[in-house]
Amino acid sequence: IEWVTTDPENQIKYANDPKCTFTFTVQAYHDLFELLSYVNSDEWYGLVPESLPILFIAGKDDPVGNYSKGVTEVADRLSDKMSDLSVKLYENERHELLTGLKRKTVFADLLEWINERIDGVNAARAFPQINIGGGEHEADTRS
C-alpha cells in the first residue's frame, strides 16, 4: 500500500479498507489493458481537441506512471497540437496526490490552474464582440 500515498495514516486506512484491497478480476485486467491500449493509440491522440486545456499531475515516486515518465511521454506526444498543456510533477509523491503529504500544495496548484483558465474565459467574455453580419455594427453584449 506504500506505493499509493506518502501519508502513513492514509496507508493504514487503505490497508484496512476492503474496497481498496480487493483482488482484480481477469475481466478488470482485460478492461484496464484495453483502455491503456486505446489511450495510447494514434486514434485517441487524434481525437483530443486542440483547444482543450490539459493539466497533467503526477508524483515522481509513482510506480504506476513509471516514476513520472509515462505522464511526460503523453504530454510530449500532445504538446505539438495542444494550445494549453501543463505538466506538474511532485517530488517525493506517489500515485494518489490528493491523499499524500503534499495534498494542500496539490489542491492549491489545481485551484490556481483552474482559476487562471476561468479568468481567461471571463476576460474573453468581457471583450466586446462586433456583430458585422446583421448590418448594424453594435457591440454584442453576450453574457
Which stretches of residues belong to each language-model region?
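Alpha/beta-hydrolase-fold enzymes
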Residues: 1-19
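Active-site nucleophile elbow and catalytic-triad environment of alpha/beta-hydrolase enzymes
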Residues: 25-46
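Short, proline-enriched alpha-helix->beta-strand connector loops that line the catalytic pocket
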Residues: 48-54, 83
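Short beta-strand/loop motif that positions the catalytic acidic residue
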Residues: 56-58
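Acidic beta-to-alpha connecting loop that harbors the catalytic carboxylate
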Residues: 60-63, 93-94
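Conserved alpha/beta-hydrolase "acid-adjacent" motif
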Residues: 63-73
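Catalytic active-site module of serine/aspartate enzymes centered on a nucleophile-bearing elbow/loop
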Residues: 84-138
